[in-house]
Amino acid sequence: MAERRIPFTLQRTPSWDVPDLHQTSRIFDQAFGLPPVFEDFSGFPTTHWPGYMRPSLMTPDIMIPQSPMMYHPGHMMAHQARALSRQMSSGMSEIKQTQDNWKISLDVPHFSPEELVVKTKDGVLEISGKHEERKDEHGFVSRSFTRKYTLPPTANIEKVTSSLSPEGVLTVEAPINKPALEYSETTIPVNVESSGAVAKK
């Protein structure tokens, strides 16, 4: 099957889909190229995170051994809640499928339409993004990613569309081909014609 690229359409206003009871799946923790938030981990002793942080990035207060008794349960829960909130609010993709439509929504806030490529090949949807090194509040950063999704066998590849919202959410949709109707068996009676009238056999 030949490779096919999907053009973008930009959404000028955000749209919200009505929730349904069909299949839905989400993929978390896809924050492409985001730096770690040290406040999420500063409340934990360094012995709990062996080799996680680079020595050059550790601040003196993090390097000081601390006793687990110093950590109040409420304080620990607050740090965990912030870490979970950050994880769930960035880089999330969602797949939804109904009887008529298949849709993937991917959070790509750091990429412009020119830096994104959406294409299909051999029943696989591939979304990739890349931008060269640029400066942000943490220094210089370059980002790239590639995500592949297996399309349903009944998806209409020729009618796949994609759109990018102002909030940086990329949505790709593919209509689902309806199966051929199955007709029940019907026996047709045979009429026998006679010279005077038509008799039913």
Swiss-Prot record:
Source organism superkingdom: Eukaryota
CDD domains: ACD_HspB1_like
Keyword tags: Chaperone, Cytoplasm, Cytoskeleton, Nucleus, Phosphoprotein, Stress response
GO cellular component, one term: spindle
Gene3D superfamilies, sorted: 2.60.40.790
Protein's cellular compartments: Cytoplasm; Nucleus; Cytoplasm, Cytoskeleton, Spindle
BP GO annotations: chaperone-mediated protein folding; negative regulation of apoptotic process; protein refolding; response to heat
GO MF annotation list: identical protein binding; protein folding chaperone; protein homodimerization activity; unfolded protein binding
Location of the sHSP domain: 83-193
Key word Nucleus present: yes
Residues modified to Phosphoserine: 15
Keyword Lipid metabolism listed: no
InterPro entries per the UniProt record, alphabetical: A-crystallin/Hsp20_dom (IPR002068), ACD_HspB1 (IPR037876), Alpha-crystallin/sHSP_animal (IPR001436), HSP20-like_chaperone (IPR008978)
Task of the protein: Small heat shock protein which functions as a molecular chaperone probably maintaining denatured proteins in a folding-competent state. Plays a role in stress resistance and actin organization.
Subunit composition and interactions: Homooligomer. Homodimer; becomes monomeric upon activation. Heterooligomer.
Family from the record: Belongs to the small heat shock protein (HSP20) family.
Protein name: Heat shock protein beta-1
The species this protein was found in: Poeciliopsis lucida
Taxonomic path: Eukaryota, Metazoa, Chordata, Craniata, Vertebrata
